[in-house]
Amino acid sequence: LTHSLTVSSIARSMGKKIGLYLEEKPEENFGRKQTEQLQALLQTVGLVHDLGNPPFGHYGEAVIGNWFSKWFLEDGSAYASSLTDQQIEEFKHYDGNVQNLRIVSKLQTMNDRYGANFTYGTMACLIKYPWNVLDSSASKGKYGYFESEADLIRNIYSKTGICDHVRHPATFIMEAADDITYIGDDIEDGAKKGYIPWEQAYRELRKKFSLTHSELFKSCDEYEQKIKSDLEPADKLAAKVRYFRNVVQGYLIQLAVDTFKKDYGNIMTGKRPAKQDLLSSDEAFVEALKGITHEYCFSCREVLALEVVGHHVISGLLDTFVPALVSTDADFSSPKSYVGKLYYLISSNFKYIAKQNYSEDDSSIKSIKKVEDFTLHDKLRLIVDFISGMTDSYAMGLYQELTGIKLHYH
């Protein structure tokens, strides 16, 4: 949540800078009202952009995808004929960004089929990669929507005027805000926890980029001279790293805004590739910043241990729920049966949504599915919706209960 709040704040500030720039261009017919709307749009998508992340974050995504890749080759091979190629690939390449759209459009249900009732523009801004998993553009498993949301995508394109394979312009801004936030915050967190040998890392970075980024390093060096000498070493380090984060984030924000301005024509006409982010014009520096955390933080004991735990928890939950619920003779009707017990453990809101069968032309419910009529895809999607919506602690607690490691008696 702290990360999302920061992304939301940075995205909003970038929206203001770009909006004020466009206000000065009469041909754009962009006024103060539009600037405020752009800010509100970016603030919203920044806040919800990570809702689809499963337990244990990006590593959790990989665990889900790897589990299904193995399952479809082994026990699940007998069921593969019941799914489309697209559905199979979606499970094998689970992506939290894609789940995000499903959450806000369906899973956060109220009284109709529209989920959180976001505008089409807001949902369009959440689609980082505007193509499906089978598209030739979906390299490295990067895609934007599930087959189950294909009708929604067509409506988004129709209502917003966005063409297939074209990003919403504000998506570039939101993505940059996300990158800027985690680049700065990861370095600060890593240095404070002692994983990053800050003095060494800073010297190496300054040596490599002192000519191209002289003002940035000059500002940091001058600030270091102003730090009170009576501060404890840990406090001095924290102050230096915090200032570095602020300076770097400020630089990257302006870099992204300037890139958006320079390439405004291509962005608005859909000619700028969706995979070309707003920080790519200073790729060497950005990659060097990311490299600091990759080198020192991603292999630290705390991270590795958490990932091992995440692997056991998520794999264990999938091992439990999938074989039981996909069985053709599964009895869902009673909590007295083993499968029934597992089914009743799934959150009621996910089961409610899985049962709805909406009319194609409006939001009315055409019929209610019986559990016995669930397709294989319905069952797998229900399980993934349930598990991916858990927090780390909830997933671990449920795993411990189901394996008998830790029981809660009432």
Regions found by a protein language model. Give the residues of each.
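Sequence-structural signature of the catalytic-core scaffold of metal-dependent phosphohydrolases
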Residues: 2-10, 14-44, 51-244, 253
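Charged, amphipathic alpha-helical oligomerization/scaffolding segments
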Residues: 6, 176-179, 248, 252-255, ...
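Non-transmembrane, amphipathic alpha-helical segments
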Residues: 17, 165-172, 237-248, 277, ...
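Zn2+-dependent metallopeptidase catalytic domains
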Residues: 113, 239, 333, 399-410
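Short, charged/polar, low-complexity loop and linker segments
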Residues: 156-161, 233, 289-297, 366-375
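Polyanionic (Asp/Glu-rich) segments that form extended negatively charged tracts
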Residues: 189, 205, 213-273, 325, ...
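Substrate-recognition/cap regions that form aromatic- and gly/pro-loop-enriched pockets
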Residues: 261-361
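C-terminal amphipathic alpha-helical interaction region
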Residues: 336-401, 405
